[in-house]
Amino acid sequence: MNYQKAVLDKKATSIKLRTLRIEARLTHEMLAELLQLNSSRVIYDWECAKKMPNVENLYNLSLIFNMKMEDLLVIR
């Protein structure tokens, strides 16, 4: 079997999420509201690579940004 473990590049993923949000002309608050989050703080945390979105939020982000879920992530 030819298997190589995928590793999530959290910093590059956080930059990608920030870029997508800005290109969509969404504020942290607007994106948090679309995702029905209690606070926009979590968006800041994602964009600083302190935390990563869970699967449900990744799915909803993919709908908001009109892309495949796996394309939101930067894998090395």
How does the language model describe each region?
Residues 56-71:
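DNA major-groove recognition helix of helix-turn-helix/homeodomain DNA-binding modules
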Residues 45, 74-75:
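Phosphate-coordinating loops and pocket residues in cytosolic domains that bind phosphorylated ligands
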Residues 15, 40, 55-58:
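Short alpha-helical elements of helix-turn-helix
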Residues 1-23:
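A short, Lys/Arg-rich alpha-helix, primarily the initiator
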Residues 21, 32-33, 62:
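The alpha-helix within a helix-turn-helix
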Residues 25-45:
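Short alpha-helical DNA-recognition segment
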Residues 18, 29, 59:
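Residues within the helices of the helix-turn-helix
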